[in-house]
A protein has these predicted regions:
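Catalytic or ion-coupling anion/metal-binding cores of large enzyme and transporter domains
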Residues: 1-59, 64-85, 90, 96, ...
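Glycine-rich, anion-gripping cofactor-binding loops and their flanking helix/strand elements
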Residues: 93-111, 325
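A short, small-residue-rich loop immediately preceding and capping a beta-strand
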Residues: 111-132, 143-148
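Short, glycine/acidic-rich beta->alpha junctions
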Residues: 102-103, 124-128, 259
């Protein structure tokens, strides 16, 4: 069977339109790439860079991107990094929800309009993950999600301090006059001890767990804390994997099936995921062409027990959840009890 031409060949090696090929080619050679890199059949891999100073939850991708690129090159691909619309949930309130769609639209335009054969979608903060998955569903080129991971566990006066969770508690204490302004700010700072997104089972951890449950990220990647060496390891492996996915023509439509969405609900229910997840998952499914409404959560998730004891519903934080096995252990438990589709 004839090997399928790479999508980027239309830009960089199209004898039918030498004029445009020359225009595309010469400008991509002005920063160190060689003609052979772009015309030898190597997949062009986009890295959707969601990290910036405006997006502190994802900021460490600025350093992780080198490791991602090394993985891509190791597997025989050519990395091309590009910025995404910045999203920081706490920095854009009360309009952060609108940024999900802005980020989605900007990703779609880049993925459609540029010579990209496959893409690594870097995620972390709440809306970055649904925006990335919606774009992957729409454009349907080989895509893989790479979460930046949660912060390390926070502590305040000897107790676990979960990002967000402790602030809601501090607001009550401040309103009652039990703490002053300075202590309020100290409590908030204690909950954010490192790089990474929220260390609770908030929307960020929940949506990245859903990406893993859908099959859109490497196994075990959702909950690795941002500063851990395993986060660098999975960044490298993700870079390698996307190159293989391009050669396999493994697109989101082959991964995000209806059964995969059902698995996402099973996992989300078991981990006590954020109540923001249903509208996000519905939107992702819609862009995948799958009718998957909110009613599925009651139908599929109603009898799934809560297996994860993490804040805000429970006691622990993400670092502890990772050490306990993370999402793979949850999926194994669900499989053992016939509450998860196999081979999806």
């Amino acid at each position: 069977m004839k090997k399928k031409d790479l999508r980027s060949k239309e830009w960089f090696d199209n004898p039918k339109d030498p004029g445009l090929t020359a225009l595309y080619l010469e400008r991509y050679l002005n920063y160190g790439l060689k003609k052979e890199d772009l015309q030898s059949g190597k997949p062009i891999i986009g890295i959707a860079q969601s990290g910036s100073d405006l997006s502190p939850c994802n900021r460490h991708f600025q350093s992780l991107s080198k490791i991602i690129k090394d993985g891509i090159k190791e597997a025989g691909g050519v990395p091309m990094e590009f910025p995404t619309h910045p999203i920081q949930e706490t920095g854009k309130r009360p309009t952060a929800a609108l940024d999900r769609n802005l980020s989605y639209l900007s990703l779609v335009e880049v993925l459609y309009g540029y010579p990209i054969d496959g893409v690594i979608l870097t995620t972390g903060c709440d809306k970055t993950t649904p925006a990335a998955l919606m774009a992957a569903a729409t454009v349907n080129i080989p895509s893989i999600v790479l979460s930046g991971g949660p912060m390390l566990d926070g502590t305040y006066k000897g107790k676990k301090a979960g990002s967000g969770t402790i602030i809601w508690e501090a607001r009550k204490l401040h309103a009652k006059g039990e703490i002053d302004y300075d202590e309020f700010m100290d409590m908030a700072a204690a909950s954010a001890p490192s790089v990474g997104h929220c260390n609770t089972m908030g929307t960020a951890s929940s949506m990245n767990s859903i990406a893993e449950a859908l099959g859109m990220s490497l196994t075990g990647g959702a909950i690795i804390p941002a500063p851990y060496k395993e986060r660098e390891n999975i960044s490298f492996e993700t870079g390698k994997r996307i190159v293989d996915m391009v050669h396999e023509d493994l697109t989101p439509s082959k991964i995000m099936t209806k059964k995969a969405f059902e698995n996402a609900i099973y996992v989300a229910s078991a981990i006590g995921a954020s109540s923001n997840c249903p509208p996000h998952l519905t939107a992702i499914a819609k862009h995948m062409g799958i009718d998957f409404g909110i009613e599925n959560w009651e139908k599929l998730g109603h009898d799934i027990p809560l297996l994860v004891n993490c804040q805000p519903a429970g006691e622990h934080l993400m670092e502890g959840f990772f050490k306990a096995g993370g999402i793979p252990v949850i999926m194994q438990e669900l499989l053992k009890n016939n509450k998860l589709h196999k081979n999806v």
